[in-house]
Amino acid sequence: MIMSKRSFLTLSGAALAFAVARPAWAQAMKVAIVMPGNITDKSWTQSGYEGILQAKEKLGIEIAYSEKVVQADQAEAMADYARRGYNVVIGHGGEFQDAASRVASRYPDTLFVVNNGQEGGDNIASADFNFRQFGYLMGYVAGKMTKTGKAGWIGGQKIKFSLDLNSSYEEGFKAAGGQEVLTAYTNDWDDIAKGKEAALNQISQGADVIFPTMDNAVIGSLQACKEKGVWAFGLYYDAIVDWPETVLQSAIFDIKGAMLTYLQLAIDGKLEGKNYNFDLSTPEAARLGTFNPAVPKEVQDEVLALAEKMKSGELKP
């Protein structure tokens, strides 16, 4: 989730003009979110849904949402909310970046935000995470826990989120003494059967620690790991709660916290047309999960020390 990005932002002239031009809303702001998957997927889409509900409760906004919106329909779904007078329209996933770019100029009075996006400008903002920090730390744990010297990593598609997580996971794995990372893409974020098949294939090749990074398809990968008795990592939430015998640690990309931050800025008239990046220094939005008791205390301490070095800037995966 990752990147060597700007850490809470460089202000461009265009972004400044965008922020200054936006007055604070005197009445309830209307916010809509368009999501790619199912709101009960215990993964990325559910986190976005919970984020908009939390924002409604804490910020007093009026909300609407659409789920299971395929990529071909994303631009029209975002445009429809803009036509209906929503002040902020959120595309929940990096794949919405193109859709936001296509419709934003037609609705200059609407603010478009892309969760897990990388770009901003005019009336488009984006929010993402330093995925590389977390990929490295999960990889380091894997390198300390593997018995075969092989780990697995599974992604949905080859987008920046995936590429950054994959490469940093391999970097951390090898830094901890691991030898080889097997990489696979399902080309489907939500197909549970494909997630399970990919994990089983890696396990058959000797991987004994696997990091699945899709959306709903992660469930299939975790099922495979549980059935075969190999370790795995969680994503987006503290997955050890649901997989206590399988998950070693989790990379928590808490989009709920990020959404609260940028929607408060929008209410105050201060949301800028730029990228907002969250990392270990912003634990309300990005943090480690709970260590499985199987992870030795010395390994836990090493990982936490690495995290501190990342916060200070001494270590940049």
Give the predicted meaning of each segment.
Residues 27-317:
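A residue-level marker of the well-folded mature domains of exported/periplasmic proteins
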Residues 1-25:
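N-terminal secretory signal peptides and thylakoid transit peptides that target proteins
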